[in-house]
């Protein structure tokens, strides 16, 4: 029973951190400001997280778990190459749109001036997603007997760059320019180009 309040407090701290990232774009979040937002002392924050870097790691763990587990579901449920790519990109964009504060972590904006390992973890997450896209594209040859004229690694990088660009626009516009805006039309164009290659 004693564990539950601690878990809830940790979650509450992370939710407040994400909320502050959303409502204070471009501003650095200090532990003093976060403690005030949570309604506890800085010492109480440090009872749950030994450092601010660990708080950001908690958000990154949430991001990794949310995205990678859903990508695995897409891989299991959908077999069509283009539909898989579409769903992975759509997942990234919808996730960022529904979690504006966390999109600043995805974009790296919230991690400026923070511990290098945090930026490294986000880079690793995007590398995993790019690898997943590359695998999806390579499986097209195995499944359909026809590949692409361009290397799958180059195409996977292009697809991920598209999603990262949309997330960057979202952050830069202070969450006004939605990442999913015009996605259906853009995807139709991208898909057409991919199928031509």
Swiss-Prot record:
HTH tetR-type domain segment(s): 7-67
Keywords: Cell cycle, Cell division, Cytoplasm, DNA-binding
Subcellular location: Cytoplasm, Nucleoid
Domain of life: Bacteria
Residue range(s) of DNA binding per entry: 30-49
InterPro entries in the cross-refs: Homeodomain-like_sf (IPR009057), HTH-type_Tx_Regulator (IPR050624), HTH_TetR (IPR001647), NO_SlmA (IPR023769), SlmA-like_C (IPR054580), Tet_transcr_reg_TetR-rel_C_sf (IPR036271)
Keyword Protease: no
One GO biological process term: cell division
Free-text function comment from the UniProt entry: Required for nucleoid occlusion (NO) phenomenon, which prevents Z-ring formation and cell division over the nucleoid. Acts as a DNA-associated cell division inhibitor that binds simultaneously chromosomal DNA and FtsZ, and disrupts the assembly of FtsZ polymers. SlmA-DNA-binding sequences (SBS) are dispersed on non-Ter regions of the chromosome, preventing FtsZ polymerization at these regions.
Oligomeric form and interacting partners: Homodimer. Interacts with FtsZ.
PANTHER family: ACREF/ENVCD OPERON REPRESSOR-RELATED (PTHR43479), ACREF_ENVCD OPERON REPRESSOR-RELATED (PTHR43479:SF11)
Family to which this protein belongs: Belongs to the nucleoid occlusion factor SlmA family.
Protein name listed in UniProt: Nucleoid occlusion factor SlmA
Originating organism: Shewanella oneidensis (strain ATCC 700550 / JCM 31522 / CIP 106686 / LMG 19005 / NCIMB 14063 / MR-1)
Lineage start: Bacteria, Pseudomonadati, Pseudomonadota, Gammaproteobacteria, Alteromonadales
């Amino acid at each position: 029973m004693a564990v539950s309040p601690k878990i809830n407090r940790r979650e509450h701290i992370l939710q407040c951190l994400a909320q502050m990232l959303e409502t204070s774009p471009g501003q650095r979040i200090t532990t003093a400001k976060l403690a005030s937002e949570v309604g506890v002392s800085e010492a109480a924050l440090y009872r749950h997280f030994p450092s601010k870097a660990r708080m950001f790691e908690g958000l990154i763990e949430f991001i990794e778990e949310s995205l990678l587990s859903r990508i695995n579901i897409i891989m299991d449920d959908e077999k069509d190459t283009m539909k898989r790519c579409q769903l992975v990109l759509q997942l990234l964009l919808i996730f960022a749109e529904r979690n504006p504060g966390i999109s600043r972590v995805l974009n790296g904006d919230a991690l400026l001036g923070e511990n290098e390992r945090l930026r490294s973890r986000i880079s690793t997450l995007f590398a995993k997603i790019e690898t997943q896209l590359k695998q999806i594209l390579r499986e097209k040859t195995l499944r359909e007997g026809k590949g692409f004229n361009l290397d799958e690694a180059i195409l996977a990088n292009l697809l991920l760059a598209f999603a990262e660009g949309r997330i960057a626009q979202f952050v830069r516009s202070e969450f006004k320019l939605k990442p999913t805006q015009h996605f259906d039309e853009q995807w139709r164009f991208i898909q057409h180009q991919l199928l031509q290659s």
